[in-house]
Each structure stands twice: as structure tokens, then as C-alpha cells.
Amino acid sequence: MRRPAPYHRVAAIMTILSLAGAGHQARLDARGGMLTGPTANLAPGHVQANLAILPQAVAGDFLRFCQRNPKPCPLLAVSEPGDPSLPELGLDIDIRTDVPRYRVWRDGKLVDEPLDVRGLWRDDLVAFLIGCSFSFEEAMLENGLPVRHIEQGCNVPMYRTNIATHPAGPFSGPLVVSMRPLKAADAIRAIQVTSRFPSVHGAPVHLGDPALIGIADLGRPDYGDAVEIRAGEIPVFWACGVTPQSVVAAVRPEFCITHAPGHMLVTDLLNSRLAAF
């Protein structure tokens, strides 16, 4: 007769299933058109991912681009050509429907922002899922660090910089950064906290004067929403997974699909599993 599993094992399994269910529910909401906005602080504890979908003919070059630029493009998963599933990231993922909002690019021009891309799917498309800073924000909040765009209920501000990425094949372009304002002491703590998560951008790439990295006006982000910067705070900048979108605009591949900035794929992976130490 098979003996029942010890209580602690059953409890652990149920906890894992419950946590995975939160990510799965977020994807179902996106798939059903009920989730169409930014995903910051959604399904707490879950890894979120940026998306870039490209034809197989240029997928190898883009893979090398990600490998050469691990700060803005830390790869979490790569699909098989034509396969919209990503079983390593979660139950029943369909990358054509499970992102709240997509961007469609043709010859480097943004032509649409649909809620699903089933009608555009092709057998030669390869999906790249890239780590997102929304994942380390959980650790920031747990350490008592403020995250302004969550406080204000808006999207994180993102900016194109004058920092060049390392090219691979046709892919090259400017680094995009996300910004969170912090007091100096909190910025030091944020460096310590986010350094533990290299697979979701890790430590900041710059803090202080935005002009040094080519940002003229923090009140006019290239992507996302401007946030309040209070007295005594400095802007802190992290490499951002929207970088491929600035590269797409520069390189102009014939076809590409990305997520809309701030509108991520919510996975079943847990943020705690990404901590390097």
C-alpha cells in the first residue's frame, strides 16, 4: 500500500501550484482581453519577461546580439521556429495571446499595437524572452526601497541613451534604460539588492546626471510614463529589455513583433529562483 506523502511535502507542492496559478491566471486574463495594461506589481513573486519575435533568417544574429549584451538582453528562453509554446517558462503558454499588448514592426516602423498576434503568426518565427526589471522590484520593495511608478500607478519611465550596444550581424543600436528615483542611501542599497539578479538586468548602469548618458529631459521618457522626482532624490538607471525595440527601429528588419513597453509576459517562474546569491 502506498504511504501518503508527509504533510510538509504536500504543503510545499500546494504552495508551488498556488504560486504558479497566479502567473497562469495573468496569462489567461491577457488571452481573454481582460488584461491590457502594464504588468508592474502584477502576480507578485513571478518572473516577467520582455518579448522579441523575429524571422528565423535573422534569429541567429539576434541570439548572438543578446549574448553580447547580457545587461539589457538577459535571455530566459528561446522558442523553436513556429512554436508559440514556451514550456520552460510556464503551463500552457501561447506567446501569440498571453502578452497584454504587442507591437508589430515592419521595416523598422511601428505599424500596430494589437492585443494578440495569432493572425500574424508564421512558421518561421522565433520568440526570444528576455528578463525584466519588474522581477527585481519585488526584492526592492521587500527591502523597504520605494518604486515610484508602482506608487503612482503608472508605467516605468524608459529612455534611449548614447550608450552603444555591442553589434552582432545587422543588430546594433542604443541602450535603453529604465529609471527609478531614489535617495542616495537607498540607491546604494538598491545596487546591493539588484546585483543579486543578473538574469533580470542586475545592478544599475548609471546614477546621477542623465545628460552623461544622453538623456535631455527626464520628464519626457521615450517609453512609459514620467514619474515624480522628489527633493533629495537622484535618478538611478538600469539596462532595459526594451533595448531590442530601439535596435529594431535602427536595423529595420522586414518583420518583428515585440511586447508594448511595460506589458510583459508573466511566467510561472518565481523571482526567488533567479537570485544569484
UniProtKB/Swiss-Prot annotation:
One of the Pfam families matching this protein, by short name: D-Glu_cyclase
InterPro entries linked: D-Glu_cyclase, Putative_hydro-lyase, UPF0317
Taxonomic superkingdom: Bacteria
Source organism of this protein record: Bordetella pertussis (strain Tohama I / ATCC BAA-589 / NCTC 13251)
PANTHER family: D-GLUTAMATE CYCLASE, MITOCHONDRIAL
Segments crossing the lipid bilayer: none
Entry keywords, A to Z: Lyase
Gene Ontology molecular function: lyase activity
Family: Belongs to the D-glutamate cyclase family.
Enzyme class: lyase
EC number assigned by the record: 4.2.1.-
Full protein name: Putative hydro-lyase BP1875
